[in-house]
Amino acid sequence: RPNPNGTIIDGPILEKEHTSFVGMHEIPVLHGMTIGEYAKMINGEKWLKDSLQCDLKVAPCLNYSHDMKYSLPVKPSPNLPNDQAINLYASLCFFEGTNVSVGRGTEKQFQIYGSPFLSNFNYSFRPISNFGAKEPMHKDILCIGEDLSQIKKVTRLELTWLIKAYTDTSDKTVFF
């Protein structure tokens, strides 16, 4: 399938010692590849277990080019409800592992961020238990932060929000 962020190649390359379920290979956060291109890379680089290589056949996406806008027909996750969240995910995922919520437990997952430890922002939300997040970070606690749901499409990895939140947090020892 096409990549909804297929025009963007940006961000740090994952270091091998930090691989996990959400980051398995040494590629940039925003890699710009289709699933087929990524599969070919995995196969060609022998990244499968024991350097296994497959007899891989990839059906090309007809009339597709990387500069085309593509909207996923099915949500990839309950926490990525729309094109805006999908576009912002690569920039907001850096809040994972911090004390800042990315909106799980709200209607604007990966379109907002906030924390009870922030104060110099004019947006607030209170995460609650829902289908996509039974126990969201800061459940039932008022979070102060920023609403990004109406900003223009991001065309690069955007670290401004992470830096703003870190700068504003009242206790930097609990940020990361």
Regions found by a protein language model. Name each.
Residues P4, Y64-D67, T155:
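A short acidic, often aromatic-flanked loop/helix-cap motif at beta-alpha or helix-coil junctions
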Residues G11, G32, G103-G105:
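Glycine-centered flexibility sites
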Residues M33, E37, E107, L157:
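Conserved active-site and cofactor/substrate-binding residues in soluble primary-metabolism enzymes
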Residues P4-I8, E37-G44, T98-V102:
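Noncatalytic linker/hinge segments flanking ATPase motor cores
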Residues K108-F176:
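Conserved functional hotspot residues or short segments at active or partner-binding sites
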Residues L62-A133, K139:
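ATP/pyrophosphate-binding catalytic subdomain of soluble kinases
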Residues P2-H18:
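Glycine-rich, charge-decorated loop segments at or immediately adjacent to ligand/cofactor-binding or catalytic sites
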Residues H18-L92:
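Conserved anion/nucleotide-ligand pocket segment
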